[in-house]
């Protein structure tokens, strides 16, 4: 049995729910789900260029967990882009 998911601090808002290849209906595509914490890790680590230690502290998780989330997110994005799959983005409620 796996451990229960820890509540994590998520700060960004996702502008879209689906990212897919142009010209192909989403019903014809395989879909990969990007989880909210993976999206946040990708945003903090790659877009905002935060160190893993700082980003992990902001999310309230360990640096190792942050590294796992970032690696998982990168793999999912790379798979979707290189294999022409749809990427389902998480719906994160805006806290404003």
Swiss-Prot record:
Mention any Pfam family matching this sequence.
Answer: DUF134
InterPro entries from the UniProt entry? UPF0251, WH-like_DNA-bd_sf
Disulphide bridges: none
- Gene3D superfamilies in the record, alphabetically? Winged helix-like DNA-binding domain superfamily/Winged helix DNA-binding domain
Q: Which HAMAP family match?
A: UPF0251
Q: Which family does it belong to?
A: Belongs to the UPF0251 family.
Q: What is this protein identified as?
A: UPF0251 protein Spea_3639
């Amino acid at each position: 049995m796996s451990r229960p998911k820890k509540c994590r601090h998520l700060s960004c808002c996702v502008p879209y729910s689906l990212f897919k290849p142009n010209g192909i209906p989403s019903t014809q595509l395989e879909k990969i789900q990007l989880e909210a914490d993976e999206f946040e890790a990708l945003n903090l680590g790659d877009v905002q260029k935060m160190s893993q230690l700082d980003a992990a502290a902001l999310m309230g998780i360990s640096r190792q967990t942050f590294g796992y989330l970032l690696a998982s997110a990168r793999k999912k994005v790379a798979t979707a882009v290189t294999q022409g799959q749809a990427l389902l983005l998480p719906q994160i409620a805006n806290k404003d």
